[in-house]
């Protein structure tokens, strides 16, 4: 069947974070926009099942839900293609941001996929400003997907904006090299630490595990 050939998995980096936190017993909520279509309804049902609040979720009758097609090569490496012209997620406006949800949160998490186009770019910046004004910790995962950007300068601008705003940074080794130009991860972490006011830096290394920086200490953990 088509589903066997193309299995459907609700997801997206921020929702994956929310799902893990919800499973650990934390209260979570999602802010964003999806189409009032089969994919959008599936995403809402999944959030409800995961006990993730959908008070900040907007259903659009005008725009479709964005879909990502993931291809795995023989080494298990992923590549992405997107059906997103124009996706409902891009059309979230400043007025649709659930301000109370942000004000009542301890951590606000975001990535660059909500900064590729307007109006969601301005909506994201407004949400970050609300978090800052209310002393909410800001967590940032660049989650760089080249297919969604017109050029490298635009994504570097978005990543640097996130680096200037976040308290917690989760970044991949490839993204860290992309933004610093350094392939030595220790040096790249120190470069980021010295340039930005970030409290905790987490670097994923794929199958090789992860690194972290916290209170002037750099550590390493092997993969599971």
Annotate each language-model stretch with its function.
Residues 50-53, 153-178:
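Structural recognition of alpha->loop->beta junctions
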Residues 27, 31-112:
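Conserved N-terminal subdomain of the carbohydrate kinase-like
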Residues 135-142:
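Short beta-strand/loop segments at the ligand-binding rim of alpha/beta enzyme cores
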Residues 2-6:
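Short, small-residue-biased leader/transition segments that mark boundaries at the very start
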Residues 121-127, 152-160, 183-189:
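Charged helix-capping and loop-helix junction motifs
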Residues 16-27, 72:
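Alpha-helix C-terminal capping segments
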Residues 100-101, 161-162, 194:
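Structural alpha-helical scaffold elements that stabilize or flank donor/cofactor-binding regions
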Residues 129, 133, 185-224:
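Conserved phosphate-binding/catalytic region of the ribokinase-like
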């Amino acid at each position: 069947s088509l589903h066997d050939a193309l299995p459907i998995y609700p997801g997206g980096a921020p929702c994956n974070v929310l799902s893990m936190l919800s499973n650990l017993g934390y209260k979570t909520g999602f802010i964003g926009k999806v189409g009032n279509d089969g994919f959008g309804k599936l995403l809402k049902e999944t959030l409800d099942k995961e006990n993730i609040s959908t008070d900040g979720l907007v259903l659009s009758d005008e725009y479709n839900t964005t879909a990502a097609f993931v291809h795995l090569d023989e080494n298990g490496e992923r590549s992405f293609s997107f059906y997103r012209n124009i996706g409902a997620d891009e059309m979230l406006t400043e007025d649709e941001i659930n301000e109370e949800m942000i004000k009542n949160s301890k951590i606000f998490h975001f990535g660059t996929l909500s900064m590729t186009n307007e109006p969601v770019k301005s909506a994201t910046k407004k949400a970050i400003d609300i978090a800052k004004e209310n002393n909410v910790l800001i967590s940032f995962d660049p989650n760089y997907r080249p297919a969604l950007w017109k050029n490298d300068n635009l994504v570097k601008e978005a990543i640097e904006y996130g680096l200037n705003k976040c308290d917690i940074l989760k970044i991949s080794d490839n993204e860290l090299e992309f933004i610093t130009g350094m392939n030595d991860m220790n040096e790249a972490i120190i470069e980021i630490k010295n340039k930005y006011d970030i409290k905790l830096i987490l670097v994923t290394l794929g199958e090789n595990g992860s690194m972290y920086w916290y209170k002037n200490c750099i550590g390493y953990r092997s993969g599971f």
